[in-house]
From Swiss-Prot:
Gene: ispE
Full protein name: 4-diphosphocytidyl-2-C-methyl-D-erythritol kinase
Keyword annotations: ATP-binding, Isoprene biosynthesis, Kinase, Nucleotide-binding, Transferase
Active site (record annotation): K11, D136
BP term (GO), one: terpenoid biosynthetic process
Gene3D superfamilies hit by this protein: 3.30.230.10, GHMP kinase, C-terminal domain (3.30.70.890)
Signal peptide location: none
Natural source organism: Bordetella bronchiseptica (strain ATCC BAA-588 / NCTC 13252 / RB50) (Alcaligenes bronchisepticus)
Amino acid sequence: MTLYDVPAPAKLNLFLHVVGRRADGYHLLQTAFRFIDLADTLHFEARADGAIGRAYELPGVAESDDLVVRAARSLQRATGTRQGAQIGLHKRIPQGGGLGGGSSDAATTLIALNRLWGTGLSRSQLMQLALPLGADVPVFVFGQSAFAQGVGEDLTAVALPPAAYLVVQPDAGVPTAAIFSDPDLTRDCASVTIADFLALPTFCFGRNDLEPVVLRRYPEVSGAVRWLFEHGLRVRMSGSGACLFAEFPTLPEAVLAQEEITATMRVAGKTTSHTHPGFRLVQASTGLTEHPLRNWIAS
């Protein structure tokens, strides 16, 4: 049996506050997650020999460090299944962009192989397997827009209004660990409540506490923020960056902004009097109400 074109959507952190740090070094966060329709796709083919093989390569990521492979092996160990899988992956979500691409791929692997192998784990059981893979993995198994606390595992579903987004990737990759270990990172933001978050338009609420650190360390990102502001876009960083996003009421408005930005970049590239930061990605996306695989799991 084979599962083709299984989606792994990107996420946005609509805000991200660092409210403390545990004794073990993990940071305590408050954030709101929303999925968007920018997505990787995976393919899963069952194997009778129990092996986990990957029919793709990720630059700089060894198979032993690949979250997809680790997720598959974690599900094998937890269930005792003797089945294996050959896995394909088509990347569309930028790596090192703060959009949760690797975490989403891992969650989709848990969900899809649970279905392919017939292992029958519940959502809560899959979320328990997800957390050791990374703090962002559980929300993709949770499958809904969520207000998150703790290290990201304490999730409460929230209903968000329809929205679209313009996602921009500056010409930089940001290692998450380096940002969280920066001595200048603010780690004592006052706690907020879900009611606080829902009382304001989502793009007006809070901030991303990681953003000042990234802007200071990565001129490509700070330059992109300035350039976009000069061209009429107020953006916020997702996760630890480097991707930035602006919110719009409708997808046509986000598409128009995408077209205007790319047209301006083309003009700037042909003249000596104008410059642009050189984006790797400019993508209009729709905010999702839930994960496309949410109904693949028994609650």
